[in-house]
């Protein structure tokens, strides 16, 4: 045999053995959970580093230093809490609703909820997105609170403060202490967030505009005319709700809902009750029912092009038809999906199935045994706090710098002069957290994003099962607040997913998608710590009838 051929054969054989040995070594390394996590972390760090370099190339000229930050539009709730009903205490509630879709649509509209190339341009309206508002007071003379919800993917704190500022006169005149606006988080509505438009076009344009600071004119998935109409309509609806306030009684029930929902992320915790907050007016008028439920409205899927409210819209429509004014308020729904199988008959079209699911929940709530509802004494206490979160997630930072989203960011530095260009500053996201306590028995935790359920009710991974091998050492929001709890998610802001620190993993790890669209790995602990501080402060400023309050 030719010596060269023999040498080549030996070399090829050795190469094959070498490749196999290398593959076996890699396979053996990947079989170790610790090594697999290390590789995932390396990938995560590399990806975030790349995005960070891109973010660093975009000007942040438009973001103020902390001492120049203007928080006009922020409302902190009650100045003090009361334990017992006031002398003339009585529940007063008002309701109003309106479509936020303009009568004439001009320009491009994108469906908000799915990242698509090309983007999902709206080509029709299946049903109109709504704003629904409920004004509430305990007639203690301390003021009015408003809870409103918009059928949309999410709405930023900046846009919410714009709505509040449109009713500045009403806030002063009627002593409105808090205006809390949330999103149903439907993934089939017109984009109100900004991330779901023509991203390549926006990146190229907005990078130039960012250099102009506040004078820049960025583009995003949001239609400016639509957003203007939405804000004005929301403001008018809140005014109408306050105008419609009437006396009555308030009840609540925790209604089992576990087989209507399912969690897609371990440890598979769901809030297995929905909360029904039911107002019965003295004059025999329409009841108001606010339904707090955690489930993603993503039923129409990735390529749906017709704007729709998804199942929350059908739920409210069914209640409206029955003569009940209704609100659907999204809960701790991070990775929680609908479970339509047990309740929806076979053979329905997609839209028929979604409609049937929403109507089934509405019928279930309206038919629930009224004797199971607890009557709430007329006492409402609300506290809201601003929270500054370090913008750790470079994806969020890039989106904010490019003005694809308009969440408020500020620069925090040690420089004495707020105008000084000090490269040591860091960017912080400004958001809001808060809670309302009704009748000393039900707390509504107002959270600015998509909350992992175990943060609300417990059940987080222990150290041996979590991504980082550590315990989640924070109490649940229910433990902190010490009452029955309902969560108002995506409330007063839209900052993405809120994941327990101990399980905040690589964006490349299986079942860890949520980390890609989260403010950062310490977001959950910072938010829970804020709730602890708010509860401690509320306890300090709680008074009873025997104490004298000097305003």
List each model region and its residues:
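Hydrophobic alpha-helical topogenic segments used for membrane insertion/localization
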Residues: 2-26
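Conserved beta-alpha junction segments in alpha/beta enzyme cores
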Residues: 23-182, 186-356, 369, 375-551
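Anionic-ligand-binding alpha/beta catalytic cores of soluble enzymes and soluble regulatory domains
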Residues: 361
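Glycan-recognition surfaces in beta-rich domains, encompassing non-catalytic CBMs
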Residues: 365
